[in-house]
């Protein structure tokens, strides 16, 4: 469900924060912006696929019903769809600008690296997963702020502050979700040697961290 949230966040940011001087309809009908938002959606979708590819054994334990559906799709098919989506994302990003292309190329690499290596480790796995969930939202900044002369950036500090406050709030919410998922997936993580926070530090510590993060969500809301 991150995909519709990111799409909505990108368009709302464009309409109310990044380009308030433009008509909402002009922003919605901006073809380059549509391509960028669509590329963000496909990049997130490809991330889900590669994550599912590496989690197939763990999901047999944690989500047996879901795994029954997954078995209808072979691992080879998942990889083929993953590479196809990434190729489409790269082409779409290049259509918008070379900066957007570099952004999404880096994002695709890091989401693979996370799924393959980082996610098995406590704390850094949670922080990275949450960062990768939020990161596509910032692609829209490349679209608007790379067009602004460097000397005029000072005039956009307030807009950037609002954007980063929203992003921080979203980051904390998604980090809480990742922590809760680790508690729910305890059996599968243990069986597959994942070093998550509940496994390494215990369930009680995990619950205390979740409570602390929930309290911290008040701060970005206060700033806004």
Regions found by a protein language model. Name each.
Residues 1-224:
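Multi-pass alpha-helical membrane architecture of UbiA-family
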């Amino acid at each position: 469900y991150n995909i519709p949230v990111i799409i909505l966040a990108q368009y709302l940011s464009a309409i109310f924060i990044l380009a308030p001087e433009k008509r909402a309809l002009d922003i919605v009908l901006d073809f380059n912006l549509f391509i960028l938002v669509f590329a963000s959606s496909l990049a997130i979708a490809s991330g889900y696929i590669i994550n599912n590819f590496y989690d197939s054994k763990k999901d047999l334990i944690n989500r047996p019903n879901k795994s029954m559906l997954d078995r209808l799709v072979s691992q080879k098919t998942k990889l083929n769809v993953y590479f196809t989506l990434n190729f489409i994302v790269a082409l779409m990003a290049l259509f918008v600008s070379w900066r957007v292309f570099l952004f999404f190329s880096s994002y695709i690499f890091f989401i693979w690296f996370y799924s393959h290596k980082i996610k098995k480790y406590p704390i850094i796995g949670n922080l990275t997963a949450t960062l990768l969930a939020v990161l596509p939202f910032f692609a829209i900044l490349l679209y608007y702020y790379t067009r602004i002369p460097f000397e005029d950036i000072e005039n956009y500090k307030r807009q950037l502050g609002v954007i980063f406050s929203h992003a921080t709030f979203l980051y904390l919410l998604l980090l809480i979700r990742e922590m809760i998922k680790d508690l729910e997936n305890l059996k599968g993580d243990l069986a597959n040697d994942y070093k998550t926070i509940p496994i390494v530090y215990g369930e009680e510590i995990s619950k205390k961290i979740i409570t602390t993060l929930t309290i911290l969500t008040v701060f970005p809301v206060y700033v806004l």
